[in-house]
UniProtKB/Swiss-Prot annotation:
Function: Probably transports organic cations.
Protein name per Swiss-Prot or TrEMBL: Solute carrier family 22 member 15
Organism: Xenopus laevis
Keyword set includes Protein transport: no
Family: Belongs to the major facilitator (TC 2.A.1) superfamily. Organic cation transporter (TC 2.A.1.19) family.
Listed PANTHER family: SOLUTE CARRIER FAMILY 22 MEMBER
Length: 531
């Protein structure tokens, strides 16, 4: 038998797989979230004022970058008035140097992009577990170095390395978990990880509220990472990866170990060798030379880019909405939680589906951001304006989180099996580019306080409009080959209990109405009518 059949014997989601889910989808995501949004707290600018030599107070910090800062007269010293420290107060990242805070976030997301590209190939060659464990160990190491570095340039370097490890390690951990459980539980595991990432944002805000030293905070959050690393040393290698490598004996041992830990009683089984795949390998030219795939890919690249840009942009802007930064950040994370069950319900509803759900959430997310510019923010206007800004920002975060969750599922259904991984990889790359740009958007407040939200809103609405040009994939068979894209698709429509053919034509599709395709559709419809 093959791995999928063996997993049904040993348990698709038994006691031990629940433990693996808790480790890789809960604890690990709680830790990953803290590193992903670290800069939202350690990069906050405390209140400060300038003083000159004759009015220097004890404990004030000399401005070593005075030439870059807008000082007046003989002002040579900065006094930070906040009750917390950050990289801004550590290295005087104010005035002309304020942009470097955004740079520190961008280099992190640049590292994530590199990590996603490299770690996938490394795990395919050397295995899921060793690459995941090594990546997690290096991430914890680099993160501690990041907290202890004495100079800002070294802070940027270690931040980049943390991004490489976090992005790559998280991807491999996700694959490892999915390959140890039954395929029917993949969506649940993915949604669980997304929800715990959101909780991790709120958790980081809570820790930051009590620990006001940025160095101590950056060190202590890695205690959780070290704990996950210790527990990860004893997890098994992916049986699916071992099977794909032809290491049948080791794959069988891994499956038997899962069964024992699940306390399952099962008869012995033997894995048969994997059949060679005769399909040719695809490349990026395959996608862009096909008119249908090219159309879908261009739209999805923009949608992924916007989802990442707005998601991380709103998260990083949580401190710019007034009120308590820790409360804003915690609410920004918790606001995501309702998004996941809501979008899972809507995308499977026959009257809504994938396309309308994605477009609707993007419209609502973008519209919420655009409405912020209508909220009056004037001195003495009262707390209502701040409350409205916060509420609309949280509503935007909820909707864009739902869009982000949908786009993963929707994208995988738009591509044929022969190019699915490649297509998802291209879209994911543009998502990372959105993350790299996101830290710089909040800086547009210096031009106009509402400009960042106008950018987020316009991007969200434009992505929603473009997504309407994509086909619906709910209850539509997944395409296996490029040829399947040319065949008129069918969908199960519950109208008086009968099945009806739904023509689905896209720009660039070739509908030559060949008798072969019509015969194939007739056979499929007749077979379905017997159900």
């Amino acid at each position: 038998m093959e791995v999928e059949g063996a997993l049904k014997l040993v348990g698709e989601m038994g006691v031990y797989q629940i433990y693996l889910s808790f480790l890789l989808a809960v604890l690990l995501q709680l830790y990953s979230a803290t590193e992903a949004i670290l800069i939202t707290i350690v990069g906050v600018t405390p209140p400060y004022h300038w003083v000159n030599d004759s009015f220097v107070a004890n404990g004030s910090q000399r401005n070593e970058y005075g030439g870059q800062l807008p000082a007046e007269g003989q002002h040579q010293y900065l006094v930070f008035d906040g009750n917390f420290t950050s990289i801004v107060s550590e290295w005087f990242l104010v005035g002309g140097a304020a942009y470097e805070v955004g740079v520190s976030s961008s280099v992190y997301f640049g590292g994530v992009l590199i990590g996603v590209i490299c770690f996938g190939q490394l795990s395919d060659r050397f295995g899921r577990k060793p690459v995941y464990v090594t990546g997690l160990a290096l991430e914890v190491t680099f993160a501690v170095m990041n907290a202890l570095t004495p100079i800002f340039s070294m802070f940027l370097i270690t931040r980049f390395l943390v991004g490489v490890m976090n992005g790559g390690m998280s991807l491999v951990a996700f694959v490892l978990l999915n390959e140890c459980i039954g395929s029917s539980y993949w969506a649940i595991a993915g949604s669980l990880g997304s929800m715990c990432f959101a909780v991790g944002i709120a958790q980081f805000a809570l820790i930051g509220y009590f620990i006001r030293s940025w160095r101590l905070l950056a060190v202590l959050v890695n205690v959780q990472g070290a704990g996950v690393l210790a527990l990860s040393l004893c997890i098994p290698e992916s049986p699916r990866w071992l099977y794909a490598q032809g290491r049948l004996h080791e794959a069988q041992e891994s499956l038997v170990s899962l069964g024992r830990r699940n306390r399952k009683k099962f008869t012995s089984f033997t894995l048969r060798p994997r059949q060679k795949d005769s399909t040719h390998s695809a490349n990026i030219i395959t996608i862009y030379s096909n008119s249908i795939l090219r159309h879908r890919t261009l739209v999805m690249m923009w949608v992924w880019f916007v989802c990442s840009l707005v998601y991380y942009g709103l998260t990083l802007s949580s401190g710019d909405l007034g009120g308590d930064i820790y409360l804003n950040l915690a609410l920004s994370g918790l606001a995501e939680l309702p998004a996941y069950p809501l979008c899972m319900y809507l995308i499977n509803h026959k009257r809504v589906g994938r396309r309308r759900s994605l477009a609707g959430f993007l419209f609502l997310g973008g519209g919420s951001c655009l409405l912020i510019m209508l909220v009056p923010v004037k001195e003495g206007s009262g707390p209502l304006s701040v409350l409205n800004s916060q509420t609309l920002s949280l509503l935007g975060k909820l909707n864009i989180s739902a869009s982000f969750n949908i786009v993963y599922i929707y994208s995988s259904e738009l591509y044929p099996t022969c190019v699915r991984n490649l297509g998802m990889g291209v879209c994911s790359m543009f998502s990372r580019i959105g993350g790299i740009i996101a830290p710089f958007i909040p800086a547009l407040r210096s031009v106009h306080w509402a400009l960042p939200f106008i950018v987020f809103g316009a991007a969200g609405v434009s992505a929603g409009l473009l997504s309407l040009f994509l086909p619906e994939t709910l209850n539509v068979p997944l395409p296996e080959t490029l040829g399947d894209l040319q065949v008129t698709s069918y969908r199960r429509l519950e109208t008086n209990g009968e099945l009806m053919l739904h023509r689905h034509e896209e720009p660039g599709a070739f509908t030559n109405g060949s008798s072969e395709e019509e015969e194939e559709l007739d056979v499929m419809m007749e077979s379905q009518s017997l159900l």
